């Protein structure tokens, strides 16, 4: 087992990994930028190393500084968390070259599944259902035109190196294809340094349902049930739940089998997520695979009583998995609390937290790195907390979430707590009747000024 793990991340996920390491008797090293000197992950780790100024490119994305921090502290493994370098094949390879275990996917696996067109071709070979469209990179606009006609409108153009909704364009008519092709490629080039595109049939108003998988060094994989991540804004998830209110036992079995087939076909090692689009007829199609821990992993942990970070560490240390597939016995919901103003177009709201009162009670979990007196830097993602409720039924989990959101007080900055509180009362949400288009019609009501 590892003696010391460096966490190449910040915020709540760094703290989350530190907590599991402490329980496992593993020493921890936090890395931080000068903007994060007062963050809780720095205070809770056994050692902490400053790796640069606030800009991510000079700190959390600066591979040489992170490797140097691992070497001077004698860390024998690095946990990348999510975001930053978690799906960076080059970083995974450099860790390998320095005899430091990367607690994540191998460089080859990241390359294979990180390139969306490659991943789709791999899944077709594995016999996993995929959205109709191109089977690889589109070589030029002429091929794009031909493919769109064959696939049938509407189509979705996607950046092969994409993520976070960048380089994606929905095209409903042939006359709009050229503009979409040009703008998607430009956006992709600017964001990823790569303008390769592929095309898929646009699945209208789908559910976004992902399956959590774990694979080990023996080539065996299992699934830990689904998460419904359909409520999104600009392709960014806002809230997630398990089980999905749209799920049936038969569909879970099929999707779980497909996800395990995908993981075993590529001999996947570690925790990963196979993401699917599910249409209104419950046909499901592979979308992508994330070769890292997900932001929303706690809801899976809650319903199957399983520490996914611990499992990541064990698998990285070559401990075989049990191979058992899991079905949720409880219902869990997560609300991502962001430092954003929901009444002002979700504009970021960094600054100093003057008051913080956290909710508590049975079935409430709060993963956060912030506290009263903490200043949220403007340099990073705006998520400051994940509020999770767990209960016997969906109705009870929603009731708990309403109560917890009412109890949750953060002052000094704007947060998305009021948005989530309104969401929990929305009739379509209460009925479990929502798709990825839900936020297009959701109107946030401003409170009446007293």
Model regions and ranges:
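Short secondary-structure boundary/hinge segments and terminal tails
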Residues: 38-39, 87-88, 113, 140-142, ...
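Conserved beta3 strand of the protein kinase N-lobe
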Residues: 133-134
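ATP-binding N-terminal substructure of ATP-dependent carboxylate-amine bond-forming enzymes
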Residues: 1-126, 138-146, 396
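Methionine-biased hydrophobic packing positions in alpha-helices, especially
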Residues: 110-113, 123, 156, 168, ...
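ATP-dependent carboxylate activation and anion-phosphoryl transfer catalytic cores
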Residues: 7-23, 48-50, 71-73, 96, ...
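Acidic/histidine-enriched active-site and ligand-binding environments that engage anionic O-linkages
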Residues: 146-156
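N-terminal nucleotide-binding beta1-loop-alpha1 segment
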Residues: 159
């Amino acid at each position: 087992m590892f003696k010391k793990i460096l966490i190449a991340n910040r915020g709540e996920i760094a703290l989350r990994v530190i907590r599991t390491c402490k329980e496992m008797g593993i020493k921890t090293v936090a890395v931080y930028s000068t903007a994060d000197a007062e963050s809780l992950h720095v205070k809770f780790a056994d050692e902490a190393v400053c790796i640069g100024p606030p800009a991510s490119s000079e700190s959390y994305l600066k591979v040489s500084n992170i490797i140097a921090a691992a070497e001077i502290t004698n860390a024998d493994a690095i946990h990348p968390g999510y975001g930053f370098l978690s799906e960076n094949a080059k970083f995974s390879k450099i860790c390998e070259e320095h005899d430091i275990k990367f607690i994540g996917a191998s460089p080859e696996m990241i390359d294979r599944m990180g390139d969306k067109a490659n991943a789709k071709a791999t899944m077709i070979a594995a016999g996993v259902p995929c959205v109709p469209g191109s089977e690889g990179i589109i070589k030029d606009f002429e091929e794009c035109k031909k493919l769109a006609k064959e696939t049938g409108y509407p189509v979705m153009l996607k950046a092969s190196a994409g993520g976070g909704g960048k380089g994606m364009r929905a095209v409903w008519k042939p006359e709009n294809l050229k503009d979409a092709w040009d703008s998607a490629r430009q956006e992709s080039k600017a964001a990823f340094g790569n303008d390769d595109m592929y095309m898929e049939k646009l699945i209208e108003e789908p559910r976004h349902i992902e399956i959590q998988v774990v694979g080990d060094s023996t080539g065996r994989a299992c699934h830990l049930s689904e998460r419904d991540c359909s409520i999104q804004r600009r392709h960014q998830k806002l809230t997630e739940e398990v089980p999905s209110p749209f799920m049936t036992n038969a569909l879970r079995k099929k999707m779980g089998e497909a996800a395990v087939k995908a993981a075993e076909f590529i001999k996947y090692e570690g925790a990963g997520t196979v993401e699917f689009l599910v249409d209104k007829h419950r046909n499901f199609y592979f979308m992508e695979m994330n070769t890292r821990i997900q932001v929303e992993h706690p809801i899976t942990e809650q319903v199957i009583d399983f520490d996914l970070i611990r499992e990541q560490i064990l698998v990285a240390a070559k401990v075989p998995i049990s191979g058992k597939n899991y079905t949720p016995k409880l219902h869990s919901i997560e609300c991502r609390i962001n430092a954003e103003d929901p009444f002002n177009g979700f504009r970021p709201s960094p600054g100093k937290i003057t008051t913080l009162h956290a909710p508590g009670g049975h079935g409430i979990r709060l993963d956060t790195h912030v506290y009263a007196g903490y200043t949220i830097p403007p340099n990073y993602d705006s998520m400051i907390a994940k509020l999770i409720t767990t209960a016997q039924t969906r109705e009870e989990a929603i009731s708990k979430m309403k109560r917890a959101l009412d109890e949750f007080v953060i002052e000094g900055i704007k947060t998305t707590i009021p948005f989530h509180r309104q969401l929990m009362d929305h009739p379509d949400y209460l009925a479990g009747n929502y798709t990825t288009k839900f936020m297009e019609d959701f109107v946030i009501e401003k409170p009446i000024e007293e």
